[in-house]
Curated annotation (Swiss-Prot):
Pathway of action: Lipid metabolism; fatty acid biosynthesis
Protein name listed in UniProt: Beta-ketoacyl-[acyl-carrier-protein] synthase III
UniProt record, GO biological process: fatty acid biosynthetic process
Top-level taxon: Bacteria
GO CC aspect terms: cytoplasm
Catalytic reaction(s) noted: malonyl-[ACP] + acetyl-CoA + H(+) = 3-oxobutanoyl-[ACP] + CO2 + CoA
Main location: cytoplasm
Record's function text: Catalyzes the condensation reaction of fatty acid synthesis by the addition to an acyl acceptor of two carbons from malonyl-ACP. Catalyzes the first condensation reaction which initiates fatty acid synthesis and may therefore play a role in governing the total rate of fatty acid production. Possesses both acetoacetyl-ACP synthase and acetyl transacylase activities. Its substrate specificity determines the biosynthesis of branched-chain and/or straight-chain of fatty acids.
Domain comment (free text): The last Arg residue of the ACP-binding site is essential for the weak association between ACP/AcpP and FabH.
Length: 325
């Protein structure tokens, strides 16, 4: 009987643009304040990509760090999967652009669009390739320049988001790694969180073809908490664990209140929850790998620990991954 093959995270990396926009800076752009933003979201500041930076640039720098941490060269990568909702171009994919810049020739490369859940979705896709034996080394990235699709006159949305990228290298392993991933969606709720322009339905006037992120925050909050509770319970039960077995919860960094609600539901102390939303804002698909990389590099996350990753985003699309780091 053949052994089970796991996909193990062999290295992590992240990149944040140099420009930082604080809440006080935001108060000069729209009618808001540090107290208003922080009390509702837990956000203090966010990073903004430079005018000459695209999503693939952020992904590239995060990937280099993950590759270095894993001791992997570009020609060893069998597959590149990027979770993003802000690709450089309509096509080719941002993953193809990243492949070329890394100097890899011939490996598969694809983008996955699941909004803020993009990295968890990309991780799930990559995990299946490794477990099936079709790939031994996979680069998985979550990267966004979400500030490019914001309405900077709408104080309810423009204060929430930032730019960044996080990456992991997955390697085939017979001992440990990703235990399971669980993906869910509900397209009937699209108008609660969306950008209503596109190639097929058409574009409007102005920057980005009139595209701008629209969100009904209270409705999103209520749905997200219930959906995340459900998928987290499903993930733990599928592997014979309960919340008290977890070493770390690494959630999507959208809103501190959602993070705290999930932790409370799991009866997890916040000391076991990785929180970066205060310094990064909501970086969409980049938020989970950014938080993971920070926790690894700070020494909090150690080899052998049990980690639960979860995310929720537009679509709605949400998901989770349970892994032994």
């Amino acid at each position: 009987m053949s052994k089970r093959i796991y996909s193990r995270i062999a290295g992590t990396g992240s990149y944040l643009p140099e420009k930082v926009l604080t809440n006080d800076d935001m108060s000069k752009i729209v009618d808001t304040s540090d107290e208003w933003i922080f009390s509702r979201t837990g956000i203090r500041e966010r990073h903004i990509a430079a005018d000459d930076q695209a999503t693939s640039d952020l992904a590239y720098f995060a990937s280099l760090k993950a590759m270095e941490a894993a001791g992997v060269t570009a020609d060893e990568i069998d597959l590149i999967v990027i979770g993003t909702t802000t690709p450089d171009l309509i096509f080719p994919s941002t993953a193809c652009l990243l492949q070329a810049r890394l100097g890899n020739v011939g490996c598969g490369a694809m983008d996955v669009n699941a909004a803020c859940s993009g990295f968890v979705y990309a991780l799930s896709v990559a995990d299946k390739f490794v477990r099936s034996g079709d790939a031994k080394t996979v680069l998985v990235v979550g990267a966004e320049t979400l500030t490019r699709i914001l309405d900077w006159t709408d104080r309810t949305t423009c204060v929430l988001f930032g730019d960044g990228a996080g990456a992991v290298i997955l390697k085939a392993d017979e001992e440990t790694g990703i235990l399971s991933t669980h993906l869910r969606a509900d397209g009937s709720k699209k108008e609660l969180l969306w950008d209503p322009v596109g190639v097929s339905v058409g574009f409007g006037e102005g920057k980005n073809g009139g595209g701008a992120l629209l969100m009904k925050g209270n409705d999103v909050f209520k749905y997200a908490v219930k959906a995340l509770n459900s998928v987290v319970d499903e993930t733990l039960a599928a592997n014979g664990y309960d919340a008290h077995d977890l070493d770390w919860l690494i959630p999507h960094q959208a809103n501190l209140r959602i993070i705290e609600a999930t932790a409370k539901r799991l009866d997890l102390p916040m000391e076991q929850v990785v929180v970066t939303v205060d310094r990064h804002g909501n970086t969409s698909s980049a938020s989970v790998p950014l938080a993971l990389d920070e926790a690894v590099r700070s020494g909090r996350v150690q080899r052998g620990q049990l980690l639960l990753l979860e995310a929720f985003g537009g679509g709605f699309a949400w998901g989770s991954a349970l892994l032994r780091y």
